[in-house]
Amino acid sequence: MTTPRPLERRSATEQAHLDAMLHQVFEQNIAFHKALGFQLSSLDPAAPALSFNMRPDLIGHFVHGRLHGGVISTALDAAAGLAVIVGIAEKFAHETADQVAHRFSRVGTIDLRTDYLHQGIGKKFTATGRLTRLGGRIASAQMTLTNETGQLIATGSASYVIS
């Protein structure tokens, strides 16, 4: 009996191409992400993350200068979506960047829960996602939003259709 040969990972050049595509899509092509100033800060499959700076147009409570709750939810949704995308890229690591990118077009949020834990006060915020399940049709993720001091602002969980 022969042992199946493990599938090879995409080359470093292909991975760099995929990483560049993810930056382009998340930072430029998704207009709302661009308007909010989201920047990918990590594509680590264990903890993909995005960051953004506080700006006056992101304030939700004008007296206290707090980050708007909708921005918090959007950042958490984006971080969870990023975790799902990176998880798909890992699951299909034998595919080229263009092949795996085609799979991303089928990802969509079907459920999002946000728990606001502290006031959204800070100069810079980081949203981190963690893939908890990647099935054939549905993926689940958990996420956190922290400020530059590491204070936990919000947590969330989300489910995504992936096929």
Question: Where in this protein do the model-derived segments appear?
Answer:
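Terminal targeting signals and extreme-terminal segments of soluble enzymes
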Residues: 1-163
